[in-house]
């Protein structure tokens, strides 16, 4: 495994690339986190996928479905189109990418613009399939101690 190339498409060795984030080192930015999440799908690292999702959304994830999809797919590649980081406290970002895979139903391509937020030195994926239960004037679910309308609401599509 020490000589394995990272599945994220960087061309670097896994241990020097996404493997260090899988081992617990915080990803330094949203794009690195997104690439490490793609690699986690390739490698079947369901726990990592859950742990790097916004903590208030983790309970709404279907771990079994994630693991099954990961295992039943042959991952064909990742292309990052853009990465936009927005300043502020906390920092937010969008990463636009296309992931390709093959499964029992053929070859697939999925293009997505994902949202991310940084909290306490860690970046988290904001999963659009798990609703954030917050009113505009409620505390933001990301833990920033700001109102939702002043924090993550603009980054949830």
From Swiss-Prot:
Query: Which domain of life does the UniProt lineage start with?
Result: Bacteria
- Pfam hit, one: SEC-C
Say which family it is in.
Belongs to the UPF0225 family.
Q: Which HAMAP family does this entry report, sorted A to Z? A: UPF0225
Protein name per Swiss-Prot or TrEMBL: UPF0225 protein Psyr_3863
Source organism per UniProt:
Pseudomonas syringae pv. syringae (strain B728a)
Could you read off the lineage of the organism from its UniProt record?
A: Bacteria, Pseudomonadati, Pseudomonadota, Gammaproteobacteria, Pseudomonadales
